[in-house]
Amino acid sequence: VNTTDWPAADFEAHRVHLRSVAYRMLGSLNEADDAVQEAWLRLSRADTGDVRDLRAWLTTVVSRVCLDMLRSRSSRREDSLDVHLPDPIVTRVDDDPAEHAILADSVGIALLVVLDTLPPAERLAFVLHDVFAVPFDEIGPILDRSPAAAKQLASRARQRLRNAPAHQATPRGSASAAAAPGGSGDLARQWTVVDAFLAASREGDFEGLLAILDPDIVLRAEAGAGPFGPSVVVRGAREVIAQAQRFAPLGRFARPVLVNGAPGFLVVRDGEPLALMAVTVQDGKITEMDVLADPARLTALDLTAVIP
């Protein structure tokens, strides 16, 4: 292989993989693109004569860039009490998530929210190993740790995920059974629950809602300067039902969509997106709801596939 041709010939072949890694590390599509661009700049300046596996080399580079970004973000956010949801990827209900390369090994919004609570090194170790099957002997050097220490970081991350509300430990290659659909049959069962929720909401059926919502459900709403009141985190079925009344008048404008490959719906009125809701379903109950109603963030989303 003539490695001097790598920057021009092969970087694009790895761009989608690198963006997928960065998105799961950062939960931000714009920051993921920035990290990938930085990897390209470093590749273009590097002497790659000794590089034998460009994909692994680039994965290491983009992971280090993401680690620096996470550490910088942690220092900025440590005093912030605002609700901040990760960037969602919104597609049509009839889309196959597998056809969207960035959604391979889909990580749902609910899991990304929990990943945002992890220390940067734990998040990196978990994402690289459990989602992308990178061995610990490659993860250790990225973190300036031994492979054994990297393994311990991933284990600690898994434990935090187990202890998070409505989350379970999951095997490598599927970062969250709760946050990503496990197949067409599983997705159909989830839609049955979501459709029942919408119907009960529109009819004001309190008992019907209680039957659908997990008693320990968590609702996170990022409202920004929108018309729905302040951003909130609410726990418990009765409390969530009370909060959901804020959105009830707009129920007739809700259209089903996939949010990171899992059920959700987008509220659109007169062609304008007003709110996006991602729903996590486990064992026939809704365990988490994440609502993005910040007008500035909604405007920035790529919704061309779902708003004609």
Regions found by a protein language model. Give the residues of each.
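Active-site-adjacent scaffolding segments
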Residues: 1-197, 205
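Hydrophobic pocket/interface hotspot
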Residues: 209, 217, 284
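Short beta-strand segments that buttress and anchor functional surface loops
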Residues: 264-270
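Low-complexity, intrinsically disordered terminal/linker segments enriched in charged
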Residues: 292-308
